[in-house]
């Protein structure tokens, strides 16, 4: 990218005496318009050319005029961005560990909480986390804009530690439910904040993979939990150790976050321009100072448009109004909420939460150990998604894997139909292995597609409504999680396992059809271009975006 003919923004420089000043560029880096004393509290960056003016100057300028500036981001990217994403992704480890550890704990609790648990009490203990996460996900959107992404992550870690200690020390069902509720509140915060934080830091060409780091940690946490479930299965009250271990990664992340930056867009909203300049310079170590300054000013211009003057309550109600009245924002909200609905009503968390109980029901004697297969499948195929989501694209992966999910669930329903009524008397029917195989098929396709694509939701929304829109979408995730976790065992008893898994297959079919007509290909696009694409309507956006996909790779339109 040649920046010589593009009007540039301001950069920090020094005169012959070493005194810092700000240089406002005109058309070439060698030409200066004025010098003003440098202040650590830089408040303003001069106005920039609009996109038409930039394109008239340089045919490639549209790459820089976007919010994410793909031309600028073609520069070498520092490994630091991977470290930041990994530190934030530890929240996913907490999420996944809690999902997996409850499966093993429910199978070995026995009467340790005062009596043998009923199905309803197991559902209550499991769903308490989802209910709390729903509450926190609903409220954390506007909190993220008020206090920042990083501070909320710090709070979530402290909350998770407290909840883990309470669960480990539980003496009755009520105490366990309270601990699960507290942990759920922390998980709900991170399920919204982490994908948004990574999205706002990530270069466009790496955004999909960087966000999937969060999902990799989720599935990694589940695998660790299933392994520990097996290790402590025969340890007296080993479930207490299993719950207590969950506090360790939370403490590790809490300490690590003190060395990570706040989101650049949040910082610019609060006029911390110099901090953003330093962050982008570190992410793009080979970029020219003028390129960094231009990028900073582009983001700042977007923040100024997205957040007009006013107090916090005015901003909130303004964002709420814009989210529901602007057609492109409504489409973004529909896609975000729909994808989260699809993920939860596919039935995956029923399998994650109750895998040990499921495998017990079909006749596996060592059901907790068999559950490790569930965690391993989820983890391995999330890595597959990590490798290909920015190469093949979100839409193509989603459509293909959804069809395989339907086949896996249908096969599971059929296998349950032919299982003997009393699996304790006949454990060699062969159909139990068909159930296991079908669940592996389902989870492999789930982890490759709908298991991670909804967490890309922050890319759907412009800055003005990002936290709010992502908050609504995440809330739908936890509503679905709550419904499934609170009703799965009851469904298995009332409409039979065959009916339950057939119902999940039906939900997936609805998800596949809706995805085909409404979900465009977004890989490789800047956030600003995504917003422009969705202005054209669902089907037009789908048609235009699919033209960008050529021979298995993503080309920017």
Curated annotation (Swiss-Prot):
CDD domains reported for this sequence: MFS_HMIT_like
Main location: membrane
One of the record's GO molecular function terms: myo-inositol:proton symporter activity
Catalyses which reaction(s): myo-inositol(out) + H(+)(out) = myo-inositol(in) + H(+)(in)
GO cellular component: endoplasmic reticulum; membrane; plasma membrane
Subcellular location(s) of the protein: Membrane
InterPro entries found in the cross-reference section: MFS_dom, MFS_sugar_transport-like, MFS_trans_sf, Myo-inositol_Transporter, Sugar/inositol_transpt, Sugar_transporter_CS
One example of a Gene Ontology biological process annotation: myo-inositol import across plasma membrane
Transmembrane segment boundaries: 77-97, 100-120, 124-144, 158-178, 181-201, 210-230, 241-261, 368-388, 397-417, 433-453, 469-489, 499-519
Region annotation (Disordered) ranges: 24-69
Alphabetized Pfam families for the sequence: Sugar_tr
PROSITE patterns xrefs: MFS, SUGAR_TRANSPORT_1
Superkingdom of origin: Eukaryota
Residue ranges that the UniProt entry lists as topological domain Cytoplasmic: 1-76, 121-123, 179-180, 231-240, 389-396, 454-468, 520-557
Topology, Extracellular side: 98-99, 145-157, 202-209, 262-367, 418-432, 490-498
Membrane topology value: Multi-pass membrane protein
Keyword terms, alphabetized: Membrane, Transmembrane, Transmembrane helix, Transport
Stated role: Transporter for myo-inositol.
Family, similarity comment: Belongs to the major facilitator superfamily. Sugar transporter (TC 2.A.1.1) family.
NCBIfam families: SP (TIGR00879)
The protein's name in its UniProt record: Myo-inositol transporter 2
Organism: Schizosaccharomyces pombe (strain 972 / ATCC 24843)
